Amino acid sequence: MKSHSKKPIKALIEIPNWLGDCVMFTPAFDNIINYYNDIEITIFGSSASIELIKNHPKVVKTLTIDSKNKFSYKAFAHLGSFDVFFSFRGSIRAKIIKFIISATNKYQYSHAKYPRGHQVEKYVDFVNDCLNTNSAPGSLSCYLTNAKSKGASRILGINPGASYGSAKRWYPEQFAKIAIELSDNFDIMIFGGADELEFAKEIEGHLIKNNISNYLNLAGKTSISELTNYISNLDIFITGDSGPMHIAASLDIPTIALFGPTNPIETSQWKNPHSVIIKKDLECQPCMKRTCPLKHHNCMKLIEAREVIDSISEVSQK
């Protein structure tokens, strides 16, 4: 729908806080933009999510809200008036913000209303319900500029972290086994956030003990833009269910995704033709817990390095 007013539609959008959720939100975001066409968007959310979205040409203003910044509801009272407000979060804080801000139309996502399907589809269904449309979910979008610097060597990326909780994490020694075996054919990039340094360091320690030097430990050293650029240059990416996994999906990077407590029906890579999922079919899966409630962590512990290595040929042929 094109705006027939002289001024563009002013929209305020609360984007998902988690990096992976924010990547999965991009098809819904694109559908909003396609519906209004002439639109100016103010977004707010976590610093990681803001960095992912802020370069879109329709975004005119950003407001970062996370643990690093002192939160104040007053900031929203002074944002001015909007034609439409979308919140892609179902939190109590989001409900309060919805009440405070001035907007002609206000919409808030509810997890309970969209219990089934992939998260991409849930976000798109929410937008369809808000706008009375029937738009299909498109591909993931990456709004960051990637200056690919692909060299002659093939690159294997390994991502041992998962910010959601320890239940989603595979084991550093298993990642190390893969890196050691494949180091003759690949340069190694180790990824991770600031809270995952010890896992990356443990992998690095195994590589050093085996006299492997063709690796780069990037854990805690990249912005979201830099992370995206590094991922764009990978030949193979091995990762748990995480934000970087979804960034890789947006770039169609061949990926082996390791799933334990979470549900690949909901959060697998969206429309990545070069993706392989490895998971164990246990009665306790998916528990959706941050830590293993049964204390054995078999959903991840039973995944072996050999089956991941054997999957590389499969994902390479896709």
PLM features: residue spans?
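Catalytic machinery of carbohydrate-active enzymes
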Residues: M1-K318
